[in-house]
Amino acid sequence: MQINREAILADWEAHPMRKPRIAKVTINIGVGESGERLTKAETMLEQLVGQKPIRRRAKQTNRDFGIRRGEPIAVKVTLRGEKAYQMLDRLLEAVDRKLKASNFDEHGNFCFGIQEHINIPGVEYDPEIGIFGMDVCVTLERPGFRVAKRKRQRRKIPTKHKLTKEEGIVFAMEELKAKVEGL
């Protein structure tokens, strides 16, 4: 994949409304079972982020895993604004600021996994809680995306204003100081 980094940066410099920003950071811990482990994951996530997570329920029954439909099996938390930038900085340190090009989707959003939460700077191991892995998803947007989300006079985002995979990669490299492998 060839990225014209200078052209993208020049476009953002000339048109500030085209420069992407982080819309939200979603942290998900899929425990796979309800009960004590789910409660521990919820406690750990609340301590890590400082915000109460919500429980996610199973969409369908899976007898092989012993999961019933509607049973809580995961916890997630969504961060927005300055809190999202600060938390993402800590989460990227846990993976040594390395991302793969395959982590990015066609709209510039990216996700990465953290194997053990104790790799995050400032987190101590607690034997009562244990160790959990997590998925981190970062959603990017441009100024003006509210047009598609508002209640009145909702409009579609024009194709030329939508983010591309290349712009998402350049944003991660420039703003978040991440190294993207596999280009």
Curated annotation (Swiss-Prot):
The keyword tRNA-binding applies. Keywords: Ribonucleoprotein, Ribosomal protein, RNA-binding, rRNA-binding, tRNA-binding. GO terms for biological process: translation. It holds the Pfam family Ribosomal_L5. The keyword Membrane does not apply. It comes from Thermococcus kodakarensis (strain ATCC BAA-918 / JCM 12380 / KOD1). NCBIfam families: PRK04219.1 (NF003258). One of its GO terms (molecular function) is rRNA binding. Belongs to the universal ribosomal protein uL5 family. One of its GO terms (cellular component) is cytosolic large ribosomal subunit. This is Large ribosomal subunit protein uL5. This is one of the proteins that bind and probably mediate the attachment of the 5S RNA into the large ribosomal subunit, where it forms part of the central protuberance. In the 70S ribosome it contacts protein S13 of the 30S subunit (bridge B1b), connecting the 2 subunits; this bridge is implicated in subunit movement. May contact the P site tRNA; the 5S rRNA and some of its associated proteins might help stabilize positioning of ribosome-bound tRNAs. Part of the 50S ribosomal subunit; contacts the 5S rRNA and probably tRNA. Forms a bridge to the 30S subunit in the 70S ribosome. InterPro entries: Ribosomal_uL5 (IPR002132), Ribosomal_uL5_arc (IPR022804), Ribosomal_uL5_C (IPR031309), Ribosomal_uL5_dom_sf (IPR022803), Ribosomal_uL5_N (IPR031310).
